[in-house]
Amino acid sequence: MAAHRRWLLMSFLFLEVILLEAAKILTISTLSASHYIVISRVSQVLHEGGHNVTKLLYESANIPDFRKEKPSYQVINWRPPEDQEKKFADLRHRLTEEITYGRSKHHTLLKIHQYFGDLCSQLLSRKDIMDFLKNENFDLVLLDSMDLCSLLIVEKLGKRFVSFLPFQFSYMDFGLPSAPLSYAPVYGSGLTDQMDFWGRVKNFLMFLDFSMKQREILSQYDSTIQEHFVEGSQPVLSDLLLKAELWFVNSDFALDFARPLFPNTVYVGGLLDKPVQPIPQDLENFISQFGDSGFVLVALGSIVSMIQSKEIIKEMNSAFAHLPQGVLWTCKTSHWPKDVSLAPNVKIMDWLPQTDLLAHPSIRLFVTHGGMNSVMEAVHHGVPMVGIPFFFDQPENMVRVEAKNLGVSIQLQTLKAESFALTMKKIIEDKRYKSAAMASKIIRHSHPLTPAQRLLGWIDHILQTGGAAHLKPYAFQQPWHEQYMLDVFLFLLGLMLGTLWLSVKVLVAVTRYLSIATKVKEA
């Protein structure tokens, strides 16, 4: 009986410890489908780790299968008026056209951020939502660092937060103290970590250029800040970035270039990894038709799949017809041009089980848009890639794919059936690409902890320690001239020039004195 009581007491104590450790965490997802997928996965990981999770979700038409999701945690949905959604759809379409035809896109990108700034103002004006979030008294907020509005939400709530970066960490070199530009390529530069002299010149100039563009982007939220924060306590977005307790980066060094990281930076690329399931029988039957030749998987992302032009579809379809492999292609059947006959070795579907197909033993190649989630899945399964990057982080991801010899990238503007077919055949037949993909797979799998375990472990760490002040370098508080030792350089330069000037003056005086003395002696 006594033993039973002791066991009962220990059970209650253990339950109490679990309840004490469970934190109330808010996650914020207000961007497009790929961002939504990652933040939803993060929310699920935190929930499964014993935390009470609430997700603030922007219910957008851009999020596929939204209504199919049945999360086990609380979700707060909000949606802007229909005319606002139409405005964003028009802006997105314009941006896509500019990218497709190689025109400048920065001004349209500014308009998109201006739209997001207006959208943010609407959300901050939703008293019902903001009051609910305040009353919940969350212990921590996890946000997408690309969603600048979420920084303002957190500032309104006055809560600690951790930031999830869905891109390469190089994107934050414009908001955080940057790694040396001599070997850390700037986001958007198209460079690798091995730069010659002119590469370093380009990298430096790109850093200056994008820094100015980043300021323009941040300025699109100025009116929202002025409207919702009282004068004298209006936050600066670039300063809010530095407040993050932790930075989770959706990448892995199996893909990314090695670089120094801050102690509060954790790479968790591969969060979307999940157990492989058998593929549907109709897909298995299609693949088996091609025997040892195998198949090619084509998936160009949720947004890109909706905007593929007739010309692009025609060229790709013609290229696939030249392959001995079968081709499984994620392409909306409603978008397929009526006057284009589907190649006999191609099967198109609105949706495909991408993870399960990448793990299939008969896969030979993955044709991708180069989105981080898709690239990490390919690395996880050791599948070579051909990338057709469209925008944002996709070109940068493909630079890394090429540098690691995991595949090649082709430009959308120059995509032609013949050259596209030759490129795919080259990657399939040249065993060096498959070998490099398998080597990256080994690196990716050799971590002692899974991405989910790393994320959960570090979240628990800062909850237990009351924050991550012990992990933040003083560089976050330093003015840029101190951080880059410019003041020391100028001081030493001034000291050197002063010493040189004084030495010249003394030398001139001594020379003049000796000259006069010589003349006196001669007289």
Curated annotation (Swiss-Prot):
Matching SUPFAM superfamilies: UDP-Glycosyltransferase/glycogen phosphorylase
Signal peptide residue numbers: 1-22
Catalysis performed (reactions): glucuronate acceptor + UDP-alpha-D-glucuronate = acceptor beta-D-glucuronoside + UDP + H(+)
Any one GO MF annotation of this record: glucuronosyltransferase activity
Residue spans, topological domain Cytoplasmic: 509-523
Keyword Membrane appears in the UniProt entry: yes
PANTHER family: EG:EG0003.4 PROTEIN-RELATED, UDP-GLUCURONOSYLTRANSFERASE 3A2
Protein name listed in UniProt: UDP-glucuronosyltransferase 3A2
Gene: Ugt3a2
